[in-house]
C-alpha cells in the first residue's frame, strides 16, 4: 500500500491557474526497493493528478531524503508531467 512521505503546504499553479497541493508518495516494489511519485491534489475538488515514477531508492529513509530536496521548480515540472500522463491515459 502506498505511503505519503511529504505533503507540501504551498500550492503549485498549473498553466490554467488551478492550484494543486503536491505530495510525495511511494511504495516498496517487488524486489525490495522503494519507488516514489508525486501526486497533485487540486484545490477545486477535481481529479488528483499523479506523475510517473520519479525515483527509485533503496529504502524509505532515502525516499524521505530525496523528497526533502525537491524544489518548487522541480514540482512545477512534475505537475506538467502529471498533466501529460493524465491526458495520455485519456483522463482530463
Task: List where the protein language model places each region.
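A short, structured beta-strand/loop element
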Residues: 20-54
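Mixed-charge, Lys/Arg-enriched low-complexity segments
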Residues: 45-92
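Negatively charged, low-complexity tracts enriched in Asp/Glu with abundant Ser/Thr
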Residues: 1-19
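Weak global preference for isoleucine
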Residues: 9-12, 31, 56
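Alpha-helical structural elements
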Residues: 3, 15, 29-35, 61
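Phenylalanine-focused residue identity feature
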Residues: 5-8, 40, 74
Amino acid at each position: 500500500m502506498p505511503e505519503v512521505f511529504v505533503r507540501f503546504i504551498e500550492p503549485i499553479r498549473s498553466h490554467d491557474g488551478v492550484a494543486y497541493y503536491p505530495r510525495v508518495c511511494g511504495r516498496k516494489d517487488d524486489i525490495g526497493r522503494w519507488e516514489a511519485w508525486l501526486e497533485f491534489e487540486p484545490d477545486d475538488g477535481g481529479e488528483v493528478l499523479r506523475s510517473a515514477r520519479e525515483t527509485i531508492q533503496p529504502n524509505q529513509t532515502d525516499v524521505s531524503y530525496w523528497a526533502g530536496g525537491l524544489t518548487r521548480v522541480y514540482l512545477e515540472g512534475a505537475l506538467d508531467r502529471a498533466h501529460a500522463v493524465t491526458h495520455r491515459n485519456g483522463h482530463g
